[in-house]
């Protein structure tokens, strides 16, 4: 249940990269819905709002600009604005974007659907029609030409957890606050449509600053918690070589600390599912790598699948994470811990038992068992180094990632684009405090450009290292412009191998071949001498070494775009295996009727 208190949430403003060119007008905004929304965003920790202007949202944008603690980041298109809010939310805990009605709202849908799939609270605000136009049988621009213009709302109903259509100032305060608090409680996107004639009108409900939210923590059913802990402890304590595997829902459950408490107490080997990478410290002595079935990191898959009990914490088992439904795990050996439910083998399944409560309590009951860790250490062989290259040999992708491994630190974050970068980045061993993000569940190519923009805008203390394929880059390339305008200093490795490599390995065809671009020329044209941007073409290891030295030295304060030329067939062995298995799953014939 939501209550309100005067206690501030403790958030601090992030420095803004580019001050607004429009003068502040706070005196004209007192007691208005526009000011309330701006203050509410600041109060929940948002310091940057990603936007694309349109005639229905311009007055609202004036009020957001007038808030001194908010920075409006104008994006090149709505899709990237949504992806940027997604990336910002990953680093900051919540993101926000503003677009215009229907033409903007339908353009941002794909990004909001991705945020929904990844359990990210994104506040999607749309400047809507004049409140007087609803129900008048009029036809408006930016609609599909019908007097009923509810199509945008209908689309958002399936990919947001709450929808607020604000057409009346009397209930605007309640609708806005309910939407934002619901996003935070459910960790899902919400949709807020605001009539274009309403943001600047004073109303008594907005006469004072918003009272900060207090989101009461959810408390487990005590009887269910005790039963789940007792049953789980008995299940695990009789096992000979149990393991623990962290999944992506650790984030939404806010249970990373409890996960490590249990891992420390149990002594089990610690693995992560691919979409859980970055949520578990990889410098822990019991960390054994990524469990991804047939494409797991070396020896991790063998240890997990040979265990007689495995604790999956916050997993998502889909066709991608299960490598075409080919995981060699058995339900009767599994303890599945979801954010609000615990399921033990083929037996007990208890709801309203929350992940952090359960793991903390189980840590006190479980016996330490390091058998599987010792087995791992006996069979583990350190990964080899890439084969010695010939002089002036074209750069191999495994050599590129050897250098990226040396580049990352606790002061960096890795953004991995959908494609072969998924597999190469999974093999990176993340130093302590190194961020890591990718979009495993939704898998929308091009996501990483906007996500890099948003993450870098939120995490100003880290330098983002983005790994993007050429096909994905062509989908969303324009917002390199916004990165330069905001003074960001990310390092982008553009892997130019002439096509959609991940699609080639699933099902090849002429549709996977793309027009090659002069990518550094493209970025230089966008740069146009304004802001700090540096580009390089890399064809050999010598080129790469020199480029990284420049990016971390003379150009350390610039956006660095490094185009890496790779052979079209130079893919990770994991992608080859994964692609064949996913292809087999996709091509299953219909079941007999």
Curated annotation (Swiss-Prot):
Q: Where is this region: Thiamine pyrophosphate binding?
A: 420-502
* Organism, as annotated: Pisum sativum
- The EC number on file is 4.1.1.1
Q: What is this protein called?
A: Pyruvate decarboxylase 1
GO cellular-component term (any): cytosol
Q: Name the residues that bind Mg(2+).
A: 470, 497, 499
Matches recorded under InterPro entries: DHS-like_NAD/FAD-binding_dom, PDC/IPDC-like, THDP-binding, Thiamin_PyroP_enz_cen_dom, Thiamin_PyroP_enz_TPP-bd_dom, TPP_enzyme_TPP-bd, TPP_PDC_IPDC, TPP_PYR_PDC_IPDC-like
Assembly and interaction partners: Homotetramer.
């Amino acid at each position: 249940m939501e209550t309100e208190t005067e206690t501030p949430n403790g958030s601090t403003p992030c420095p803004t990269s580019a001050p607004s060119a429009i003068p502040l007008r706070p005196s004209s905004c007192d007691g208005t819905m526009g000011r309330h929304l701006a203050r509410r965003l600041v109060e929940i920790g948002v310091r940057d709002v990603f936007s694309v202007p349109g005639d229905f949202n311009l007055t609202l944008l004036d009020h957001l600009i007038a808030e001194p603690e908010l920075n409006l980041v104008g994006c090149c298109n709505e899709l990237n604005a949504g992806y940027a809010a997604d990336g910002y939310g990953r680093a900051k805990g919540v993101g926000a974007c503003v677009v215009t009605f229907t033409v903007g709202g339908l353009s941002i849908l794909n990004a909001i659907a991705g945020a929904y799939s990844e359990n990210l609270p994104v506040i999607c605000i749309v400047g809507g029609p004049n409140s007087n136009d609803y129900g008048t049988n009029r036809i408006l621009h930016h609609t599909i030409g019908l007097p009923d213009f509810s199509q945008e709302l209908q689309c958002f109903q399936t990919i947001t957890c709450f929808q607020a259509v604000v057409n009346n100032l009397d209930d605007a305060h309640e609708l806005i606050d309910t939407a934002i608090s619901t996003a935070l409680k459910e960790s899902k996107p919400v949709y807020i449509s605001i009539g274009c004639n309403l943001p600047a009108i004073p109303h008594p409900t907005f006469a004072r600053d918003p009272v900060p939210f207090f989101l009461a923590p959810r408390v487990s059913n005590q009887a269910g918690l005790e039963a789940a802990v007792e049953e789980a402890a008995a299940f695990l304590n009789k096992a000979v070589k149990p393991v623990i595997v962290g999944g992506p829902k650790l984030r939404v459950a806010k249970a990373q600390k409890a996960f490590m408490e249990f891992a420390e107490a149990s002594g089990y080997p610690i693995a992560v599912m691919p979409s859980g990478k970055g949520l578990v410290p990889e410098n822990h002595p019991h960390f054994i790598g990524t469990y991804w079935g047939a494409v797991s990191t070396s020896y991790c898959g063998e240890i997990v699948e040979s265990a007689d009990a495995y604790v999956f914490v916050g997993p998502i088992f889909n066709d991608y994470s299960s490598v075409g439904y080919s995981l060699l795990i058995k339900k009767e050996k599994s303890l599945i811990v979801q954010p609000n439910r615990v399921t033990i083998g083929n037996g007990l399944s208890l709801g309203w038992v929350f992940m952090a409560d359960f793991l903390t309590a189980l840590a006190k009951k479980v016996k330490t068992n390091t058998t599987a860790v010792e087995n791992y250490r006996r069979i583990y062989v350190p990964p080899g180094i890439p084969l010695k290259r010939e002089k002036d040999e074209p750069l191999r992708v495994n050599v590129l990632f050897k250098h990226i491994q040396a580049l990352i630190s606790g002061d960096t974050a890795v953004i991995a684009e959908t494609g072969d970068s998924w597999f190469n980045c999974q093999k990176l061993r993340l130093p302590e405090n190194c961020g890591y993000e990718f979009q495993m569940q939704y898998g929308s190519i091009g996501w990483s450009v906007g996500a890099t923009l948003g993450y870098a805008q939120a995490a100003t203390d880290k330098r983002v290292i983005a790994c993007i394929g050429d096909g994905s880059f062509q989908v969303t390339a324009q917002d390199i412009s916004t990165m330069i305008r905001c003074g960001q200093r990310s390092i982008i490795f553009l892997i130019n191998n002439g096509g959609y490599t991940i699609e080639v390995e699933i099902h090849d065809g002429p549709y996977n071949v793309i027009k090659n671009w002069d990518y550094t020329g493209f970025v230089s044209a966008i740069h146009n001498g304004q802001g700090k941007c540096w580009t390089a073409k890399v064809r050999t290891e010598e080129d790469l070494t020199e480029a990284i030295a420049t990016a971390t030295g003379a150009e350390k304060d610039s956006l660095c775009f490094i185009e890496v030329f790779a052979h079209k067939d130079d893919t990770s062995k994991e992608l080859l295996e994964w692609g064949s298995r996913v292809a087999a799953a996709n091509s299953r014939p219909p079941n007999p009727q």
